[in-house]
Amino acid sequence: MVPKHTIYCLGEVLLALDADAPLAHAESFRPRLGGDAAVLAQACAAQGGRASLLAQLGEDPFGHRAASTLAAAGVDTAHMRFSRTLPTALLFEAGGEALSYRVRTAGLQFAPEQLEPGLFQPGDALLFASSGLCDSPLRYTHLAALTAARDAGALTCFAPCLEPALWPQPEGESTPREVTRQLLPRADIVLLTTEELEFLFGTAEMRVALFPLLRGHTQLVLLARAEGIHAFTRTNHAFWPGLSLPAPRLAAKALCCLLQKNSTPEKLPRLTTRQLQTIL
């Protein structure tokens, strides 16, 4: 059953170019769609969800290629913006080496005033990751979207999908760890891996990290670990032993299920262990 509500995926969309040879010697590249928002939106659409992308691309061939790819994957691109003055971001990758061109690009310059008023409706969801939280207008668009979604009664979900290498680090700028930790308590649902847990809190011990995680607005935490996937509310716990899912697919699967059940921020604290066990 396809949920009647929309999962809005906010963040960055870029064109990734992969090479087999080291970047300094590469003569050809394979293009693919990249960026957290694009990956999350595609994962939601693949789960049968109604996924809509909130992002800005350049009014250029790369931007239109990305939009066409997303539309072909079943993602609603009607709310995307296109800039005539800023290009689509590019990411070159080869054998673990990455070189990004993103600082003065359309994606990171997606500003709060470009969000449509009244976009979110009760029963919708806002899903976002961390790469768009570096110091840019896009960071403040995330804050504005979180406020708008909460005011509308929509669920909010933060799946950081941390890639610190993608964060420019000018002197004096907040680090990925600091900004991510600041945003965690503003989301109703948080999804982390063991590696992210250790990066953010200095420990892989989930019982220790749960105390700083289950605070603020956060009512549900999903942890993807080697032994399986855990779900925690402030009172209950569910576990799927041996289950392994990439973070975007895990977030998409959980959100699609919660929307099918007409979950709201107010209902999350009341989820029983049996109900939790049905979200994956």
Q: What is each residue range found by the language model?
A:
Residues M1-V75, L276-L280:
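Glycine-rich phosphate/adenosyl-contacting loop at the front of the ribokinase-like
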Residues V2-Y8, T147-D151, A204-L280:
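Conserved phosphate-binding/catalytic region of the ribokinase-like
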Residues T6-Y8, L15, D124-A125, I189, ...:
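Structural motif
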Residues C9-L10, H79, C157-F158, L191-L192, ...:
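General beta-strand structural signal in soluble alpha/beta enzymes
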Residues R32-V39, G107-P112, G172-T175:
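Short secondary-structure boundary/capping elements
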Residues R50-S130:
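Conserved N-terminal subdomain of the carbohydrate kinase-like
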Residues L119-Q121, L183-L184, R215:
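A short, aliphatic-rich alpha-helical micro-motif
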Residues S130-F211, G228-I229:
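Conserved beta-alpha-beta core of the PfkB/ribokinase-like small-molecule kinase fold
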